[in-house]
Every structure is written in C-alpha cells, then in structure tokens.
C-alpha cells in the first residue's frame, strides 16, 4: 500500500484538496497506489468540485480520468437526498468502446471502497452473491456502461430499468438511443455533471450531430467538463457545447531548456528511424532487439485496417517466436476487438499490439514500453496520441516513427515546429541487403502457400497507398517519390496491384516473380473449387480469366440467383432467432416473462415515439423546402 504524504506538506496531496475529499476516497487513492495528485488532477479537481465548468488540456497519460471521476462521485454523494429512480445525475461520453469500458472499470474500482455503491453494483443475475442492505435514503453512485455492438438498445433499456443507475458511461450513439426513451429522465432537478472525454475527437464531424442531439436532451444548468490531450484544436466548437464561462486548464511539460515546449510526458523518449523502403519491416526486429530490457508490451501502428489484416500474418514470420503479435482494428466485430484487447493486456510474455488509430486515443494500457509508428499518421495531430500510449503516469517509454530517407525526413522539422521534438533512434541500426532479401523471401513463402493471403496483400497495399496519398503534410509525403519495387518486395508481394498511380510506372511490375497464376491456389477448398470453375468457364467461353476479387466473382452469378440466396439466408437467420427466443421464453419464470412483456412494450413505445418524431422532422423539412421554393416557376423542360 502506498503511504499517504503528511497532511499539508504538498499542494498535490490528496488531503489538501479544497473542498476536501471524503475519507473513503483518500483511502481508495492510497490503496490504489496514487500517493499524490498529478498536476492536472491538482488543477482540475478543486475547480470541478467547486461548480466550475472546465476545459482541460493535458498530455496523454497525465491522469485526466480521475480528474473527472472524483468530482462526479463526490458531487452525487453530497446531495441532500438520493436521485429519483430512473433519473440521471451524471453522464460521461467517450468516443470509443474501449475507452468507455476503461472509464467504467476505473469507476467500479473506485466505488468498491464505498460500501453502499459497491452493494448496488452487485450483478443483477448473481442471486448467490451476498448483498449488504442499506436504507433507501442512503446516497450511492450506480454507473451503467452503454456500448454499441455488445448489447442491443432494448437490453440496455431493460438493464437501466432494473438497475436504475445515476451515472451513464457511454459512446455517443448508444447514449442518444437510451436518452430517447420516455423512461429515462434528465431533469434539471437531478442532472448535475456532463463530461466529454477526448473532447476534440468527440467534436469531429462524425460525432457532431449526435452530440448536439444529446445536449438538447440535457438541462442547460449543469456543470460541464471537456478533457483531452489537444483541446485547443477544437476551441471554435467548444461554445456550441454549452459551457458557461469555463476555466481553461493547460498542463504542459518542461523541455530541457526549461520552457514549456513539449506536449508529451517527460518520461517518454520520442525518436525517429530513417530506413530504406526495402528494409522497413526487417528493421522492426532490430528495433526490438536493441531496446533493453526487452519490451514486454509494444504497440505497432499502421495506417489501415487492411494493413493490420495482412501484416498480422507476415510480421510473425519476420519477428520470430519471441513476441506474441495481436491484431486490433475498428472493423473487427466488437467481441473480437474486446477479446484481442484483453489478450494483449493479460499476456505474460512479450506482446505486440498491431493496430490502427483506434488504439491511439484514451486507452489506458498499463506498462507499454515501446510504440513504433510503422506508418506516420495522416493527421499530424494523431502523432502525440500514438506516442502517448507509452510513458504513461511517469513510467519510462520509447516511441519510434519510421521514415524513408530523403524528403520524409523533413517530418522531423515539421514535428519540431509543432512542439513535438523527436531525436534519432539510438543505438544506431545497420541495414543489410541480405536481411531485407531474407525477410522478403519468408514473406513470399507464406503468400505462395495461400492465394487468399496474396489477395489480402494486394488489398492492403492499395489501401496503404490511398492513406499515404491523403497525408495532410502532402509536401513531405509525396506519392511521386515512392520506390514502388522496393515497397512491393518489402511487403512480400508477388506483383504490384493495378492502380492509377502506376500507369506511368515503367519498372518491373512482376517484382521479379515468375508464377503460373492459373495453378496458384487457395487453401480453402470451397474457394479454390469456385476459382477453378470460373477458370474453366473462362476457357470455354474464350474470355480471359476473371479477377479473383469479390466484385468480379459476384458479376458471374445471375442477379436472380443472388437475390434468392440472400432471401434464403435471411429466412434461416429469422428462423434461428425465433427458435432462440422460444427456448429462452420456455426457460423463464412467470415473473421474468412479465418483465419481458413490460420491456417489449416500452421498446415498442419508444420506437413509435422515435418514428413520430422522425416523421414530424421530415414534414417540417418538407414544408420549409416548399416555402423556400414557393416563388420558383415550375420547370417546363428543354425546348
């Protein structure tokens, strides 16, 4: 147990906060190993507890989560009376499922030290769990996690009605669905605090409309906190969120010059490595072997989901058996993402998370030693978020961004201007053509064993190029400067894919590979059978073999056949769903059946209300359009 510092000896002591924190909170901080507050916590907690709106910009890994969790908990536990049933006291909005899950987990760990709240959080379906009884007038905090993909809106509503939480931790879309229910209440009399975590990302175009709809359902008289690593880049939109004279807190890190010139933790060393394209993936093993001690948790960032899918099959061949490589990207199913994320967290052997920017923001992954940006991010703002996965909470960390020699090295000066300085990777790494050739051979051996991996590689290379061409620092990352043959060989490709960018390329598009493509087969027997059938049809008709991609394959099937297959699939799915519901219903008690009926009625009522609102908005929009165009003459057609 981490000892508490003597009372009053430091402005960052937990017991020095004004207004003071509860005794059980002080005990929780000590038991959880937080000896004193971080600078951002020391600045934000007193203001947020003193009924101020706050805008907090601080480096990643600086302890922002507790900066809003503690004020929320303290506020709800100091009310004159408990919040009414099915009324909300606070909402925390997160841009990603993973971040929302982590915030909820931290809150549960904190509330475990508050007996009434801990008792209220006992799982509803755990009838055997001992449940301590408290009077109904006892103040407590009950959080509920809302995530799209893991549960349905109906299940979330059902759990809300049973649990009656007073704090919601959610992603924007699922939160809006729940708040649309007439059974969920956020009146001014009960609602206290709203937190937007990773605020700049929430205010992006993708969440803007959803966020505005949420805010319309919340009372204006509330306390609001915006927390992020780069709030300043979204300042123009903060006013729309509805803060009232917010206090802006900016916590920076002093550089070696003593000036506040860094936007990342001082414990994080940020470096760059200039590698020729042919040696890029081979150099990864050299990076891992040169870092001492051996990194136990590493994160490799690439630019696209397709890149993760392909490289997750190739990189283990180049890195050897010493590291467990785990893929994670935004197009994975929610259960796959959670499973892979948990595998990485719980791994006891050296592990590498191969991921996209889905893991660059907010995720509190403990003990990350190394971050390698195989692909520099298209948006320079993302650079510090990627780096910040390492060096969290004062722990030492190393970040490496890989650049091609030449113009890409100007990225170093570009980052320096943005107050994100990087230095050359040390110790220096030597590159040999023999290592690069060996890496290419191993990758190609795997690709030759299964045509599916070849298809995956072609798709990944094209998607990587599209991402590269859209880099915001386009004067530094130029498609015209790319060495196509070296890149293709480094990726282990058997040929360069057909792309508009290669129309003027006069080099060897086969990459020196001679292959009988007609006999290049899939490991999957059904897929290979289908390929041979298409090949036979092409030979008989005198037409060249169609492409193996899904689009061409689907064109060879009659539309009516596709429609029939789709209908059969939908029927099977519906039959399976009905069968599962019947089995579930038969296993229910009469009380459970009654609750299920009530929930169904509530959901149907909610859907009807949403449909009515949608029709009203459409009618209003139509009327507005008609009004705006009422003076226009009717189009008579062309002469």
UniProtKB/Swiss-Prot annotation:
| Coiled-coil stretches noted in the UniProt entry, renumbered to this chain | 561-624
Record remark on domains: The Q motif is unique to and characteristic of the DEAD box family of RNA helicases and controls ATP binding and hydrolysis.
Q: What is this protein called?
A: ATP-dependent rRNA helicase spb4
- At which positions is motif DEAD box? 197-200
**Entry's family note:** Belongs to the DEAD box helicase family. DDX55/SPB4 subfamily.
Q: Which organism is this entry from?
A: Aspergillus clavatus (strain ATCC 1007 / CBS 513.65 / DSM 816 / NCTC 3887 / NRRL 1 / QM 1276 / 107)
Family annotation (Pfam families):
CTE_SPB4 (PF13959), CTT_SPB4 (PF23681), DEAD (PF00270), Helicase_C (PF00271)
Query: Helicase ATP-binding domain: from which residue to which, for each copy?
Result: 45-249
For this chain the motif Q motif maps to 14-42
Record keywords: Nucleus included? yes
Which PROSITE patterns does the UniProt entry name for this protein?
Answer: DEAD_ATP_HELICASE, HELICASE_ATP_BIND_1, HELICASE_CTER, Q_MOTIF
Q: Where does the chain bind ATP?
A: 58-65
